Amino acid sequence: MTEKRAVILLSGGLDSATVVAMAKAEGYSCYTMSFDYGQRHRAELNAAARVARDLGVVEHKVIGLNLDGIGGSALTDSSIDVPETPGEGIPVTYVPARNTVFLSLALGWAEVLQARDIFIGVNAVDYSGYPDCRPEFVEAFERMANLATKAGVEGQGFRIQAPLQNMSKAQIVQAGMARGVDYSLTVSCYQADDEGRACGKCDSCRLRADGFKAAGVEDPTRYF
């Protein structure tokens, strides 16, 4: 039987951990990729490693990027405060072109691995309004992937899978629980401390807490 491989973007947060579990349940051999991109919440990298071990991925790779050299986001520029109340429009926690960059590197690894599926945990229901989390972006990137690669041109098409795209945060939590995700291993907070404890105030913390509450599941998040 031919091995079915997938490259999965794993941040270490709730959504991406759920996606790994979903892909594994579908019979994929999972290869996870995380990024040390200068984010202020580097505790998520430790969380990603924990999740990868717990879910038994084949290989977990961490790629170094200096997106903090570009700046323009509260997640990569310490001079920009992380908002603690909801605002209008695209928030300052948006990292310019982040998912485009991440998916491009995942695409390169997928081509080397001869994997045809790339999974990303973006969501367009309970989310912060980032433009690179929308279905239109995912569809456009898939078209580009099949135009810009040797494998794509030779007819071995890539699929960009975003299984959480139309799910509420509560539905995501329920899907993960059904597949054995240990959410105590994950970190979602934009300004988590070195031990992975959360602030409980940022947009990501609010979405996470609301998701557990709506799902009727005890929230294992630790706060500072």
Curated annotation (Swiss-Prot):
**Enzyme Commission designation:** 6.3.4.20
Q: Which cofactor does it need?
A: Zn(2+)
Keyword Nucleotide-binding assigned to the entry: answer is yes
State where ATP binds. 10-20
Catalytic activity of the protein:
7-carboxy-7-deazaguanine + NH4(+) + ATP = 7-cyano-7-deazaguanine + ADP + phosphate + H2O + H(+)
Quick one: a GO biological-process term for this protein?
A: queuosine biosynthetic process
Where along the chain is Zn(2+) bound? Answer: 189, 199, 202, 205
Q: What sort of enzyme, by top EC class, is this? A: ligase
Which pathway does the record list?
Purine metabolism; 7-cyano-7-deazaguanine biosynthesis
Q: Which InterPro entries match?
A: QueC, Rossmann-like_a/b/a_fold
On the tree of life, the source organism's domain of life is Bacteria
Gene Ontology molecular function: any one: zinc ion binding
Q: How is the cofactor bound?
A: Binds 1 zinc ion per subunit.
Which UniProt keywords are present, listed alphabetically?
Answer: ATP-binding, Ligase, Metal-binding, Nucleotide-binding, Queuosine biosynthesis, Zinc
Describe the task this protein carries out.
Answer: Catalyzes the ATP-dependent conversion of 7-carboxy-7-deazaguanine (CDG) to 7-cyano-7-deazaguanine (preQ(0)).
Family per record: Belongs to the QueC family.
Q: Which HAMAP family match?
A: QueC (MF_01633)
Q: Which NCBIfam families does the record associate with it?
A: 7-cyano-7-deazaguanine synthase QueC
Protein name as it appears in the record: 7-cyano-7-deazaguanine synthase
The organism encoding this protein is Pseudomonas putida (strain W619)
